[in-house]
Design a protein with these regions (language model features):
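Catalytic phosphate/metal-binding cores of nucleic-acid and nucleotide-processing enzymes, i.e., regions
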Residues: 1-99
């Protein structure tokens, strides 16, 4: 089933909030292509998330921005469904536990 970017982003915000964190919206008129959200979680954990409608991919400009952020040592995730939000949060929880 196709989910809108708005639905995926809302699920991400709620999942991050449940873990005591915030998913800050990034609005940059000076650097196009940055991910939609900067996620900050307890324990000094920070990563970027690009949300998309189901089946949609990052544009070339976005991919270049993601690579720039990764080259600086940040994790960048592109998710296009609420199921992938759940998968990402499970991965983050496992990393927090050192597994």
């Amino acid at each position: 089933m196709k989910e809108s970017e708005k639905v995926v982003e809302a699920k991400l915000r709620e999942a991050v909030k449940q873990r005591g964190g915030v998913a800050l919206k990034i609005l940059s008129q000076y650097h196009a292509g940055l991910p939609d959200r900067l996620v900050l979680l307890p324990g000094s954990r920070a990563f970027f998330v690009e949300t998309k409608s189901t089946g949609c991919k990052a544009r070339l400009l976005q991919k270049k921005a993601h690579e720039m952020l990764r080259s600086l040592g940040f994790s960048v995730y592109v998710i296009d469904s609420t199921e992938k939000v759940s998968d990402l949060m499970q991965l983050i929880d496992l990393e927090r536990l050192g597994l």
